[in-house]
Amino acid sequence: MTTRLGSVLHVPEYNTLEEIDAARQALEASLDGYAAPAAFGLGVATRGPSGDILDVWYPQPNLDAHRFVASALAHATGHRSGTSTAPLDTAQLDAVVETLAPAEACTTMAHPNLAAARLIRRMVDAPPPRGGERVVVAAFIGSLDDDPIDAIDAYLRLHLLSTRLVAPHGVSVQGIFGKLTNVVWTNHGPFEVGGFELARGQLRADGLDVVVNGVDKFPRMTDYVIPSGVRIADASRVRMGAHLAEGTTVMHEGYCNFNAGTLG
C-alpha cells in the first residue's frame, strides 16, 4: 500500500530501478526550487571546543550519482540548490535512513549510501572523540567550479580527490587554506592546538600513550581514504586530497600534496 507522509511519498519497498527512480522524481518534485548537486556526501565531523570543525570523514562521497540519496538529504536538511552544508540531528539522520531503506529491496544495485548512513547512526551513539564532539553533517556542491564555503565542504572536495572521483584540478579548491583549521593530528584523533597540552596530560593520566603525527591543516590521506592498488611507505608523506592512481608507489622520501598526484 502506498502512503504519504508530509510531502514525501512512501511505499513499503522499491523492488526495481524504475521504482527507485519514480520515488526520486516524486521526492524532487516535492522540494520547491530543488536542483540536483554535482557532488554531495553525508559525513561525520569532529567539532573542537572552540566550535571549529577539525575534520570530516565521508564514508561515501558521491559525484553525479545516487540522486535519490541527494534528494533525501536535501529534504532532511532544507537544502535546495547551489553549494551548502548543514548539520543533522538524530531525528534528521533517522529520517534519511527511513526514506532510503525501501530501496534496499532492489537487489540489482548496491546501496552504499544507506550502509554509510546506518554506520554513521551507530557512530552517533559511540563515545565522543577525545578532541571534541561528533557532529553529523551533509555537504552539497552545486557545481565543481564553486569555491569551498567552509571546512565541511572542503573535506568533501578532498575526499572526491583521494577517492579518485575527480582528478587533480577537477574541482575548485580555491581558498581552501582559509576554510581549514590548524590541527594537532594524533593517534587519538584531531585536537585543537590551543589547550592541547592539557588534553595530552589528561590522556597520559588515563594511562594512554600519545603520538603526535603532525600539526597541519591537512591530515594524512590514509587516515580517511585508502585507494586500491597503491603502496605508501610512509603515510605522513601523503596529504589528504592527494590523487593516487592504481599502481602508484610512494617511497619513504616521496611526497604527494593535495590536488596533486598520479593519473595512471
Task: Describe these PLM feature segments.
Residues 1-223:
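Terminal amphipathic alpha-helical/low-complexity segments used for targeting or macromolecular assembly
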Residues 225-264:
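Structural signal for interior beta-strand "rungs" in well-ordered beta-sheet cores
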